[in-house]
Every structure is written in structure tokens, then in C-alpha cells.
């Protein structure tokens, strides 16, 4: 029941996002990020566990990661978005200004990833990888701002970053279980 209600909520949000928000505001990705992050809460709730600080931090991680990730892709494909008349941030702001937004969201994403460690009682494996990959995400963000890398480079690495964050949580938990 929780799962079906949660999936219904995601579809409703995606419908509202796709038909109402996406064609009308350059902040569509920020607003749509909630629907993209909702599966974290649905998965957590599906285990029968109450939503707590840990679940909301994981939601926040994906929510904050989403805009920077997609804005980089939008910079890469800005002419396609202009042609489709979608008001993505890069179609209405300069690449430099969009890169500043990407940097702010990247920083918030990295901080959130580090806050997760004590809340979920994760150990050194997670903390080390979150720190190293977080620093590199910030370096990529600065590289985008200073025109030293192409937007697609940030986009591709941000996929790797999020995958490593979640995989390192699993590795850390499995390592802890094995050594107890």
C-alpha cells in the first residue's frame, strides 16, 4: 500500500512537472528534483521503517544533486532547449551564471553527503570516498565555471559521484556487518 501510494505520488509529481512546470520556469529542474528524489523515500518507507533524519538527508542529497547534474547537460545542449522553447536556466542565463548555480548546488550536495555519515552511522570507507569524490565534484564545478572543462565532463562525473556515494554506503555497511 505504501509503495503504490508512493509511486502514485511520483507519477502525479512527474505529470505536474512535465506538463506545467517544465515549459514555464527556468527553475523547473529544482522543482522537478523532488519527484526525482522521491524514490529514496519510497524505498525507505517500503522497508517498513519510519521516515527519519537519515531518509530525509538521502532525499536531500538526490534533490540537491539533480539541478547541477541537469544544468550541465542543459549547457551542453542549450541550442536544443532553445529550439524546443524550454526555459532551462542556461537558455535564460549565461553559461558563467549557470555555472555559479551549479557550484552552489554542488557544494550543498557535498556538504549533505558528509552530514549523512554521522546520521546513518557510516564509517571511514564512506567518509573517505564521500570526501575524495566530493572534492573532485567541486574541482569539476570550478573547471566548468572557469571554462577548463566541457559541461559534459561535469555531467558524466556527477553520475559517477552519486553512484559512488550510494555504493560506498553499501560497502561501508557490509564491511561493518562482516567485522562485528
Could you say what each language-model-derived stretch is?
Residues 30-47, 155-169:
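Small-residue-rich segments of transmembrane alpha-helices in multi-pass membrane proteins
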Residues 12-18, 60-78, 110, 133-144:
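Transmembrane alpha-helical segments that form the membrane-embedded catalytic/substrate-channel core
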Residues 5, 40-62, 112-125, 170-180:
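Helix-coil boundary and interhelical linker segments in multi-pass alpha-helical membrane proteins
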Residues 1-11:
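Single conserved hydrophobic/aromatic residue that forms the stacking wall/gate
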Residues 19-29, 146:
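Membrane-helix interface "capping/anchor" motifs
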Residues 64-114, 120:
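Solvent-exposed interhelical
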Residues 138-164:
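Interfacial loop-to-transmembrane junctions
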Amino acid at each position: 500500500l505504501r509503495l503504490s501510494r508512493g509511486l502514485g505520488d511520483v507519477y502525479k509529481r512527474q505529470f505536474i512537472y512535465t506538463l506545467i512546470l517544465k515549459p514555464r520556469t527556468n527553475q523547473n529542474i529544482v522543482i522537478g528534483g523532488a519527484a526525482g528524489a522521491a524514490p529514496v523515500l519510497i524505498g525507505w518507507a517500503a522497508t517498513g521503517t519510519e521516515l527519519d533524519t537519515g531518509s530525509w538527508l538521502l532525499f536531500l542529497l538526490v534533490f540537491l544533486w539533480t539541478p547541477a547534474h541537469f544544468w550541465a547537460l542543459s549547457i551542453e545542449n542549450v541550442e536544443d532547449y532553445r529550439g524546443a522553447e524550454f526555459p532551462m536556466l542556461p537558455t535564460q542565463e549565461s553559461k558563467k551564471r549557470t555555472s555559479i548555480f551549479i557550484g552552489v548546488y554542488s557544494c550543498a550536495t557535498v556538504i549533505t553527503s558528509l552530514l549523512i555519515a554521522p546520521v546513518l552511522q557510516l564509517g571511514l570507507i564512506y567518509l573517505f570516498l564521500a570526501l575524495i569524490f566530493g572534492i573532485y565534484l567541486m574541482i569539476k564545478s570550478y573547471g566548468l565555471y572557469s571554462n577548463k572543462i566541457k559541461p559534459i565532463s561535469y555531467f558524466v562525473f556527477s553520475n559517477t559521484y552519486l553512484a559512488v556515494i550510494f555504493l560506498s554506503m553499501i560497502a561501508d555497511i557490509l564491511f561493518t556487518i562482516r567485522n562485528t
